[in-house]
Each structure stands twice: as C-alpha cells, then as structure tokens.
Amino acid sequence: MKILVAMSGGVDSTVTAYKLKNLGHEVIGCYMKLHGKPNYHEENIKKVEKVANFLQIPYHILDLQEDFKNKVYMPFVDTYKEGKTPNPCALCNRFIKLGKLLEFAKSLGCEKLATGHYARLENNLIKTAVDESKDQSYFLASADKEALKYLIFPLGEMKKEDVKKFASTIEVLKSFATQKESSEICFVEDTYVQVLDQFMDTKIPGEVLDSSGKVVGKHEGYMHYTIGKRRGFEVRGAHEPHFVLKINPKQNQIIVGTKEELKISEFNLKNINLFIDAKELDCEVKIRYRSKSTPCKVEIYEDKSAKIILKDPVYGLASGQMAVFYDHDKVIASGFIE
C-alpha cells in the first residue's frame, strides 16, 4: 500500500514511518512547514532526512505557512481578542494535517495518510489510544468524517514509553528516543500572550466586576485571562477564592465569582461535527483535553447547533473550546462551545 507519513522529526512520526516500511508498504515522508521559524525547520528537516535516508524512502517538504496562518494562527489571535479560549490544535488537525496534507497525499496517488497521533480507528470511528495518558482522540475529533477512511494511526496500540524503547533499540534512531518532546501549541514558545503582543497592546488595565456588576478591583488586560483563572487580578474584600466567570472584551472587563458561580449544568454548541447519524445523543462529553468525561444528553438542531444537558455540573466551561462526545471509547461527535 502506498502511504504518506506526516514526519515532524520527532520520535512518534519516526517510529510510525519505520513500522509501516517494515510491514512492506511503499512509504513516502512529508514534513510540513507551518510557521516562520527557519532554525526550527532546518533542525527538524535534518532529522526527517536522516530517517528517510535510513529507511530509503523519498520525502517532501510541504510549505503550508499561508494556510496555517489563515486557518489556525490568526483565528487563534482573533478568538482571544473576542475574550474566548481557542483550540488551535483542533483547527490544525481539521484543516491542515487531515485537510491540506491529505489532499497532498491523494495528489501523490497515496491510498492512506499515516500520522504519529495516539489514537485508533474502528469502523470509520476514532477510538481512544491504548495509552490513556497520551490519548489524542480529543484533538482528532475535529476531523472531517470523510477523511477518516484514509487515515492510519500505527501508534494507537502502543504506550509512549514502548515507542521510545523501540526507537532506542535501533542505532540510527537512538537519539530520537531521548529528545525533548514538542510543546503542546507548536507556535507558542512561552505564553500565548507573547503571541498576542505582536498584534495588539495586551497590557491595558481594566475593571474587575462581581456577578452583580459591582466594580471590585482591577486587572492587567483582559487577554491575560481565561474562564476559571483565579490569579492575576484584584478583588477587594474577598474572603474566598474568586475565579474568572466571564470576559467582556469591548469594555475590557472581567467578571469574577466564587467556584459555585463557575458551575455549569448545560451549554450550547455551534457547528456540531457528527460521526454517526443521530438527532440526539446519550453519551459522555469532554469539555477540554485533560478533563474527565461527563455523562450528558445532546439535542441536535437543523442548523447544526446543539444543546448539551449534563448529568453532573462542570466548572470552567470556556467559550471557543471544543467539546468532544464519546460512546465509551469511540468519538461520535464534536463541536465548539458557544
């Protein structure tokens, strides 16, 4: 089978390419340039070239910087401007890795696209990985349903520690087993505010309000805060911890309250992405990557919006984040929180 492998220069994509080549497939590597960091790309391309030469496979360098800027980077900036919390990895998977890269794979005549994600596929549905601590099914839930039939996740049945051990047994790949893992958001080196600083003044002080609308303190600029944050702002006369409940970007205000006020029992979604045919769901939902799943009921409307009613309340629901719905270990839907 002819397979394009997304190669980043990391241990996961390296072992992915190795495994598929060893199974006798015709493997082609591809490194994606997503943002303008020449030194970063130069270092990673050297690693990809080293692996490609060792495996005796061809590889391509695909410049997707413009697509990445339009579909991922600027929406990241704009979402924070709106006082919401973006999910750039979900957008990148949908439009870039499982979008533009898949188009490129097809243009080469490849039957499949393989990535080093920790996830599995079964009956055209994404499943959680064997290694729960590294499971990436949440971020892959933004994928177009039609893309799934072309995907392979060779590491889905492996533990991360075993992937590293495997690489360490092969002389040429030993260095990949010990290298530092990439950061969660590839274009954020330290904090997301440093990215926003390139486009706007993030340090404009504003008012802190309580849930009744009373001014109770000051903050250092609304973009420094996300829903649920409890530090970095002043609340005069507070006798218990206060958390960000809401952000009002137009007035440069943040609304704060107690943990009890942060509690949510239902919420709305826009643009629900369904992997099964259904008008309502009885399932579990994750409201962010590292959160535990919560039982819920989902009512789906004609305009692809949805209402989610939770069995147990959750804390810190952030507009702009992705909610992912599971039937046991299978992803059945996703959507962005309004």
UniProtKB/Swiss-Prot annotation:
It holds the Pfam family tRNA_Me_trans_C. It catalyses: S-sulfanyl-L-cysteinyl-[protein] + uridine(34) in tRNA + AH2 + ATP = 2-thiouridine(34) in tRNA + L-cysteinyl-[protein] + A + AMP + diphosphate + H(+). It is an enzyme of class 2 (transferase). SUPFAM superfamilies: Adenine nucleotide alpha hydrolases-like (SSF52402). Keywords: ATP-binding, Cytoplasm, Disulfide bond, Nucleotide-binding, RNA-binding, Transferase, tRNA processing, tRNA-binding. Catalyzes the 2-thiolation of uridine at the wobble position (U34) of tRNA, leading to the formation of s(2)U34. This is tRNA-specific 2-thiouridylase MnmA. The gene is mnmA.
